[in-house]
UniProtKB/Swiss-Prot annotation:
Keyword Transcription carried by entry: no
Protein name as catalogued: Shikimate kinase
Function text: Catalyzes the specific phosphorylation of the 3-hydroxyl group of shikimic acid using ATP as a cosubstrate.
Organism (species): Chlorobium chlorochromatii (strain CaD3)
HAMAP family found in the cross-reference section: Shikimate_kinase (MF_00109)
Subcellular location: Cytoplasm
Cofactor(s) listed in the protein's UniProt record: Mg(2+)
EC number: 2.7.1.71
SUPFAM superfamilies: P-loop containing nucleoside triphosphate hydrolases (SSF52540)
Homology family: Belongs to the shikimate kinase family.
Binding locations of ATP: 15-20, 121
Length: 190
């Protein structure tokens, strides 16, 4: 599979801004936007929470990987990945080989603040599905982030999304992506 720089994968922890920034970035670049989780929900006719509850995480991850594969031939598309998709070794390799990976990075406290009122994040609930305290949410995010961050850090481009206006983040990303694509184009001419 040949790497296609115009297929852009946004990765990062839940709450890092992928679903918010993704459509704006796609519009800025003149690309399409696809939210992988939303696509899975449409295909299954169920929310991610329902899929996790009924089929379990392993079944969800398998479906996530299969759905991801259907997107790999696209061009000029920004794809928002689920926060845990890159934990799957095959999905990680597919994404790295297929396109440009962009890591939207935020600190634990910011992620916890953004996610504290969300009820649709199955990995941020207690063992019996109960709502966690702010401290417990921060601890769980820190644990998951420690596991996922080595994969996130393999991204082609990293942008901090903390304490920035969304428009500024989109402008910075657009510049970095355009610069990255020019660099790739120049190196392929040599």
């Amino acid at each position: 599979m040949q790497k296609e720089p115009s297929l852009i994968f946004l990765t990062g922890f839940s709450g890092s801004g992928k679903s918010t920034i993704g459509p704006l970035l796609a519009n800025s670049l003149g690309y399409e936007f696809v939210d992988l989780d939303a696509l899975i929900e449409r295909e299954c006719g169920k929310s991610i929470n329902q899929i996790f509850a009924e089929a379990g995480e392993a079944a969800f991850r398998q479906h996530e990987e299969q759905t991801l594969e259907t997107l790999l031939m696209r061009r000029k598309t920004v794809v928002s990945l689920g926060g845990g998709v890159l934990e799957q070794p095959r999905a990680f390799e597919l994404v790295r080989q297929a396109g440009t990976v962009v890591y939207l990075k935020s600190p634990v406290k910011t992620l916890a603040r953004r996610l504290s009122n969300k009820t649709d994040r199955p990995l941020l609930k207690g063992e019996q599905g109960e709502k966690l305290s702010q401290e417990e949410i921060e601890q769980k995010i820190a644990e998951l982030l420690a596991r996922r961050e080595p994969r996130y850090e393999c991204a082609d481009i990293t942008v901090e999304t903390d304490a920035k206006r969304i428009g500024s983040t989109v402008e910075e990303l657009t510049r970095k992506i355009e610069r990255y694509m020019r660099t790739l184009a120049l190196s392929s001419e040599e």
